[in-house]
Amino acid sequence: MTSEVIEDEKQFYSKAKTYWKQIPPTVDGMLGGYGHISSIDINSSRKFLQRFLREGPNKTGTSCALDCGAGIGRITKRLLLPLFREVDMVDITEDFLVQAKTYLGEEGKRVRNYFCCGLQDFTPEPDSYDVIWIQWVIGHLTDQHLAEFLRRCKGSLRPNGIIVIKDNMAQEGVILDDVDSSVCRDLDVVRRIICSAGLSLLAEERQENLPDEIYHVYSFALR
């Protein structure tokens, strides 16, 4: 549990905000120096997501997606805009969202909203999104705030909509990264939080072909 590794919740959030403010608004910056894995990540995410967009009568719609912890829009540009009519982005770092407007280019016109907000304080509009994509950002929320955020996301899904979490998984327990002020949870902890948010796990998949030295990365589809 995050309560065991986070001594001061307020400082946990403020330190992360300060950390991201000094990160360059580039793909390499978004990926902590691992910009070269971006295509591997996006291609796997596309396959994972398309199984829900292609299903029969219960298939997920393609009207609007929400990119959480969007940064400069790496995922919006390469995964979401090609598949959805419109996308909203939310990130705590204003400079990233400003840079996104340049980075996204012409297709960026289909980004409806750029929300500058931490996810612990963000409430997505009810009944608005077919897909809510939450990647490499859940570690910046406490367990309680993550469960509460997922509940709010559940309420903002359109019929047959899904939430996707894609993130690092620890081998065991919860590990604090003091540099960027985030935590890495193991699979059981993440599944428990998902369950406590009243969500069902539709699919779970481990990302392949990543460098050996980084955490295992898993995707979860939820509803």
UniProtKB/Swiss-Prot annotation:
Pfam families: Methyltransf_PK
Effect of residue 19 to A/F: Decreased methyltransferase activity with CENPA
Keyword Flavoprotein: no
Catalytic EC class: transferase
Main location: nucleus
Known outcome of mutating residue 182 to K: Induces a strong decrease in methyltransferase activity
Effect of residue 180 to N: Reduced methyltransferase activity with CENPA
Compartment annotation: Nucleus
N-acetylmethionine carried by residues: 1
Keywords annotated in UniProt: Acetylation, Methyltransferase, Nucleus, S-adenosyl-L-methionine, Transferase
InterPro entries given in the database record: MeTrfase_NTM1, SAM-dependent_MTases_sf
N-acetylthreonine carried by residues: 2
Gene Ontology BP term (one): N-terminal peptidyl-proline dimethylation
GO cellular component term of the entry, any: cytoplasm
Record field: catalytic activity: N-terminal L-alanyl-L-prolyl-L-lysyl-[protein] + 3 S-adenosyl-L-methionine = N-terminal N,N,N-trimethyl-L-alanyl-L-prolyl-L-lysyl-[protein] + 3 S-adenosyl-L-homocysteine + 3 H(+); N-terminal L-seryl-L-prolyl-L-lysyl-[protein] + 3 S-adenosyl-L-methionine = N-terminal N,N,N-trimethyl-L-seryl-L-prolyl-L-lysyl-[protein] + 3 S-adenosyl-L-homocysteine + 3 H(+); N-terminal L-prolyl-L-prolyl-L-lysyl-[protein] + 2 S-adenosyl-L-methionine = N-terminal N,N-dimethyl-L-prolyl-L-prolyl-L-lysyl-[protein] + 2 S-adenosyl-L-homocysteine + 2 H(+)
EC number: 2.1.1.244
A GO MF term: protein methyltransferase activity
Impact after mutating residue 180 to A: Induces a decrease in methyltransferase activity
Gene3D superfamilies in UniProt: Vaccinia Virus protein VP39 (3.40.50.150)
Domain of life of the native organism: Eukaryota
Binding site for S-adenosyl-L-methionine: 69, 74, 91-93, 119-120, 135
Impact upon substituting residue 177 to K: Induces a strong decrease in methyltransferase activity
Known function: Distributive alpha-N-methyltransferase that methylates the N-terminus of target proteins containing the N-terminal motif [Ala/Gly/Pro/Ser]-Pro-Lys when the initiator Met is cleaved. Specifically catalyzes mono-, di- or tri-methylation of the exposed alpha-amino group of the Ala, Gly or Ser residue in the [Ala/Gly/Ser]-Pro-Lys motif and mono- or di-methylation of Pro in the Pro-Pro-Lys motif. Some of the substrates may be primed by NTMT2-mediated monomethylation. Catalyzes the trimethylation of the N-terminal Gly in CENPA (after removal of Met-1).
Family in the record: Belongs to the methyltransferase superfamily. NTM1 family.
The protein's name: N-terminal Xaa-Pro-Lys N-methyltransferase 1
Species in which this protein is naturally found: Homo sapiens (Human)
